[in-house]
């Protein structure tokens, strides 16, 4: 999950906020997962593993289906009312508001270049006459646009920004784009869910370097003790192979953050 406007967000208003204090049940860890996220099955397992590492009973709360309005308001409300921690957030500097903090990463994913062409092995093989795309606002697409701007006009591909990873993949499948740069976990999930994407494949980003991003969990900034313990638990699960086992068990395109 990524909300571009997070850095500008004021603490959201929640009606009767005074009713909600810190949960006093010291035997449970309530963790939220977003059913819209591509890593949902992985997040569920990692949340349970974190709870176990803390010797707590894990209580999963699935959110997102009936959300309306700004996600940032919903995140604040569920952290205030329901969950101690919310899994599935990219570790991007200077994005999150002061009232929110993020754990260390538990997996590292990559942005991938996807095409329907069976012959191309990398971006360098894509003819300059072809149109390439990327999901607008992502760090990988920003780097791609910066790279294209550094080239002479005659050496550039035409670049078309798209609203979402799913739209980008559909445009590749429909032949509107020769290739598209998307979040690897999104491609993993969407290819399983949509038969139109079965023929799509990943090619190398060369001449661009790999574009990776760590993913962790958010919680209220005031929960400093919990944050420290979550980081220790994640580090232990990364070190003992638990997270790697979860990722491999799902064939998920990511690696543990060491």
Where are the regions a protein language model picked out?
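Bilobed "Venus flytrap"/periplasmic-binding protein-like clamshell domains
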Residues: 36-53, 112-164, 185-186
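Periplasmic-binding protein-like
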Residues: 23-28, 107-114, 192-235, 250-258
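Hydrophobic residues within well-ordered alpha-helices
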Residues: 50, 75-80, 126, 168-173, ...
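Extracytoplasmic small-molecule ligand-binding "clamshell" domains
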Residues: 10-89, 93-95, 249
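Extended ligand-binding regions for polar small-molecule ligands
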Residues: 41-54, 119-121, 127-139, 211-254
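A ligand-binding cleft/hinge motif common to bilobed small-molecule-binding domains
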Residues: 77-80, 85-98, 143-146, 173-211
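Ligand-binding clefts/hinges and TM-proximal coupling segments of bilobed small-molecule sensing domains
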Residues: 10-12, 139-160, 198-199, 234-258
């Amino acid at each position: 999950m990524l909300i571009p406007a997070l850095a500008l967000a004021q603490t959201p208003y929640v009606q009767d906020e005074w009713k909600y204090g810190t949960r006093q049940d010291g035997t449970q860890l309530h963790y939220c997962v977003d059913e819209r996220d591509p890593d949902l099955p992985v997040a569920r397992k990692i949340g349970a593993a974190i709870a176990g590492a803390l010797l707590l009973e894990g209580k999963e709360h699935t959110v997102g289906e009936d959300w309306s309005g700004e996600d940032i308001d919903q995140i604040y409300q569920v952290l205030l009312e329901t969950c101690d921690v919310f899994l599935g957030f990219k570790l991007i500097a200077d994005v999150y508001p002061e009232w929110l903090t993020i754990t260390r990463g538990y997996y590292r994913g990559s942005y991938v270049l996807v095409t329907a062409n069976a012959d191309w092995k990398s971006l360098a093989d894509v003819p300059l006459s072809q149109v390439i795309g990327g999901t607008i606002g992502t760090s990988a697409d920003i780097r791609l646009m910066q790279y294209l701007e550094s080239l002479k006009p005659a050496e550039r591909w035409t670049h078309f920004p798209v609203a979402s990873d799913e739209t980008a993949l559909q445009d590749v499948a429909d032949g509107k784009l020769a290739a598209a740069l998307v979040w690897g976990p999104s491609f993993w999930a969407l290819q399983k869910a949509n038969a139109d994407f079965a023929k799509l494949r990943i090619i190398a980003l060369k001449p661009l370097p790999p574009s990776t991003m760590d993913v962790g969990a958010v919680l209220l900034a005031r929960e400093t003790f919990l944050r420290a313990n979550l980081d220790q638990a994640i580090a232990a699960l990364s070190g003992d192979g638990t997270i790697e086992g979860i990722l491999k068990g799902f064939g998920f395109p990511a690696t543990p953050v060491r």
